[in-house]
């Protein structure tokens, strides 16, 4: 395939790769029952003036996931003609496909509109070190266009210490860090909102809230009603079925405070897989590929197993712990 691309991408099917054109939003059809994968990995050629931030804004991708999918590429000057992987193929998060699901480990939100067979997915900025985003099951309790911002005392103190004192209230407008719209969550003190900055989406940059591109939060504003459930999880390893095959998508694990975790990754991936009883029976697993996927943490779904009655994959074996 393409020699610069991450090693595990050699296991991606050609059908999962396509040449990309600009998209307005990642609105994708839900897969059939028993299937878990949406979208396709896309490839573009960078223009001279492109940065990962520009490309991410155009394709609803965050900075961290762009970096992970394109190791070795300069995020601020990829270079004209450089092939860029767009990680726009996703394994849906585990659990009910309803309301909003936020997966901290992938800096991404999924929204399942009621009564429609589609899912919307958007990149997020999450809480930075010392200001972790919560793991919770909550709901949208209010929607506010053109919000003002009343900085909490802790944030005012932080800014004052940096020589950047904040007013008691920041009015609505282009300088407001909440952007043009906010959703208030039932978990006290937490919001989903826009931004007054071009950068920071798909990164650990907020004070615990969830920051979106302004066009994305405005699109959500027109779709998401008050009362919508919001499930916040932290799952770096997602397993999914597609066409009778099992796929793994790996991201850098984060601890409960949103910092990169020192967890035993092999144990964590086995535990995540064992939670999916529907996929762990009668499989032939390619453990070499599993190790590659876990090591790469590039956010790309990769085939790791087939039913035991199918043609065996290279280095395959029945389900065993990673040793």
Regions found by a protein language model. Name each.
Residues 26-38, 63-99, 230, 236:
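Extracellular LysM carbohydrate-binding repeats and other cell-envelope/extracellular binding modules
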Residues 223-239, 243:
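A short beta-strand-loop micro-motif that forms or neighbors metal/cofactor-
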Residues 90-198, 219-222, 250-251, 256-322:
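Gly/Pro-biased beta-strand-loop elements
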Residues 47-76, 118:
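LysM (lysin motif) carbohydrate-binding repeats in extracellular/periplasmic proteins that recognize
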Residues 1-12:
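Bacterial N-terminal signal peptides that target proteins for export
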Residues 20-22:
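N-terminal signal peptide c-region/cleavage motif recognized by signal peptidases
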Residues 206-221:
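Short beta-strand-centered segments at strand-helix junctions
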Residues 27-60:
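Primarily a LysM-type cell-wall glycan-binding module
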